[in-house]
């Protein structure tokens, strides 16, 4: 059975590559490309469903809960900071999503909103991932017992099945591939089991 921390780190690699694609798309918009609402909506949907509901959901509902039980403070320190940043990320994704959901020609205000929120969200999430990979996850790995890890791996599977729905994870990986492919990303994404 896969180790829970390894699963989360694999998901980070997928998210990073979609962030690269979003950055590439935003750069083209900055250089004059017309905003495509459908494309923006697809980025927002992926970031909401995979990065937030699926990935942050497993962290918040399973990993962080256990760390708090083990004595990590919830309100401050690494867990508190990660929760705060998850909240910030949600606000940016909601604003990006609002542009995707709009109708008619994109207004200059919407274009500005897309650029502002994407330009703030991408570095926020990249730094966030770095902090988890280099600080919080290693701390967690030291504190979690083998029993914790087994329980967590099973809880992750149940979360994928019950919260996300059967086959949803695979569909989100396919969506990540499409987003990467459309923005010049040609390397195959890491295969997820």
Predicted regions and their residues:
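Small-residue-biased structural context
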Residues: 1-193
């Amino acid at each position: 059975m896969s180790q829970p921390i390894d699963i989360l780190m694999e998901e980070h690699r997928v998210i990073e590559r979609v962030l690269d694609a979003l950055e590439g798309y935003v750069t083209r918009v900055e250089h004059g490309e017309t905003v495509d609402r459908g494309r923006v909506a697809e980025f927002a949907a992926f970031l909401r469903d995979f990065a937030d509901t699926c990935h942050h959901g497993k962290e918040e509902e399973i990993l962080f809960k256990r760390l708090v039980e083990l004595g990590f403070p919830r309100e401050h320190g690494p867990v508190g900071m990660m929760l705060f940043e998850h909240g910030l990320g949600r606000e940016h994704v909601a604003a990006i999503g609002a542009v995707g959901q709009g109708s008619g020609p994109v207004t200059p205000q919407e274009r500005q909103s897309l650029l502002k929120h994407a330009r703030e969200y991408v570095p926020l999430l990249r730094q966030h991932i770095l902090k988890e990979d280099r600080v919080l996850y290693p701390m967690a790995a030291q504190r979690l017992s083998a029993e914790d890890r087994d329980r967590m791996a099973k809880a992750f599977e149940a979360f994928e099945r019950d919260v996300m729905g059967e086959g949803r994870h695979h569909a989100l990986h396919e969506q990540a591939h499409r987003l990467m492919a459309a923005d010049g990303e040609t390397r195959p994404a890491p295969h997820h089991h």
